[in-house]
């Protein structure tokens, strides 16, 4: 029996406002616990909230970028529940009348085809506080309480974990590109909950869904969905019934575990917040927001392919990060060689970033340095092999390529007479290999080139070395 997954994502995105959603407290991350609080975000009696206009603007901006329609009249509601990190015993959110609705994201499938993932709604809400656990007990930090969020709710259009990850990657790149969030999953400014059920292929009815929480990376999302898919299938195959519940991803044991039974909307007793007026949005305001949105990632990807003629795969990776795309364009302006910039970014530079667990914006050398570095190779001042050592030195020290080349004497040797003498010595010292080459073992050419490069410490121009060796062997 073949099963398929039915997956929808609820993505919570912290907005990059300087102050909280309903008060003037700072949203700065990492401050001393309970220092960015006031009577409003602590829910003290008599304190009245006032909606931050920037929150509405950022929510609209996200909605427009994600192809949503904007509700011209929306309101704030109270979601009632008791938990220690919720000081008011209710959360200010939007239920019946969200800010945005009916959007979509287009993702690329593994076979190269495009697929639309529809977005049901985007609504504004405030974040809760944060629980801190240590050996002395559990403490609550309310600095995060009242920080503005948008929740982006997809329809259950995804059929496997890879589609879900692709959707989240695309969503993150859009939100970062338009400047509404830094989307740092490790800091919790982008959090994702997944709803997943399974059904037999061909069946139109949805199965019983479970919600999964505590996934703070793309890898965790993929692993959690794969595990839950297999778990639910196993339950059904054994004659059981999947129970609607909330589960969390246990990273240490690579499995989902039960948190609580799943609540329905009725359990939260939503009703309008009487302390906040309805939000009226004019056509002019919508147009202003539209005009403020720059180039979106999919538009940038299309332009890069046409303008720079670099491979689609490279373009997709480079444009998925605003910082990487900007680094690429600035380096290309200097070097006038987009293909080389792409190759170095996708190759050695990405390897060094991953090895040192840092991002492109934290790199020590500038895009201008990369452009100058590529010009040194293109002008034959240094060789490609020297370039690999040079880029690592730039990465570690932040020094300019010209300074390192001068300090270490790395200038490429293009002197044909000097190279000829070294070639003659290599061939003279390896008579058996020369005979083998002439008898048909042509792969030995690489050995001879390697010996010359070893003697010259990689400084000899490899093109000239190849030409001279071939000429000498064929005499």
Curated annotation (Swiss-Prot):
Protein name, entry field: Aspartyl/glutamyl-tRNA(Asn/Gln) amidotransferase subunit B
Physiological role: Allows the formation of correctly charged Asn-tRNA(Asn) or Gln-tRNA(Gln) through the transamidation of misacylated Asp-tRNA(Asn) or Glu-tRNA(Gln) in organisms which lack either or both of asparaginyl-tRNA or glutaminyl-tRNA synthetases. The reaction takes place in the presence of glutamine and ATP through an activated phospho-Asp-tRNA(Asn) or phospho-Glu-tRNA(Gln).
Top-rank EC class of the record's enzyme: ligase
Catalytic reaction(s) noted: L-glutamyl-tRNA(Gln) + L-glutamine + ATP + H2O = L-glutaminyl-tRNA(Gln) + L-glutamate + ADP + phosphate + H(+); L-aspartyl-tRNA(Asn) + L-glutamine + ATP + H2O = L-asparaginyl-tRNA(Asn) + L-glutamate + ADP + phosphate + 2 H(+)
Keywords attached to this entry: ATP-binding, Ligase, Nucleotide-binding, Protein biosynthesis
Record's keyword annotation contains Ligase: yes
SMART domains linked to this entry: GatB_Yqey
Record keyword Protein biosynthesis present: yes
Family membership noted in the UniProt record: Belongs to the GatB/GatE family. GatB subfamily.
Any one GO biological process: glutaminyl-tRNAGln biosynthesis via transamidation
Disulfide-bonded cysteines: none
Protein EC: 6.3.5.-
SUPFAM superfamilies per record: GatB/YqeY motif, Glutamine synthetase/guanido kinase
Assembly with partners or alone: Heterotrimer of A, B and C subunits.
GO molecular function: asparaginyl-tRNA synthase (glutamine-hydrolyzing) activity; ATP binding; glutaminyl-tRNA synthase (glutamine-hydrolyzing) activity
Taxonomic path: Bacteria, Bacillati, Bacillota, Clostridia, Eubacteriales
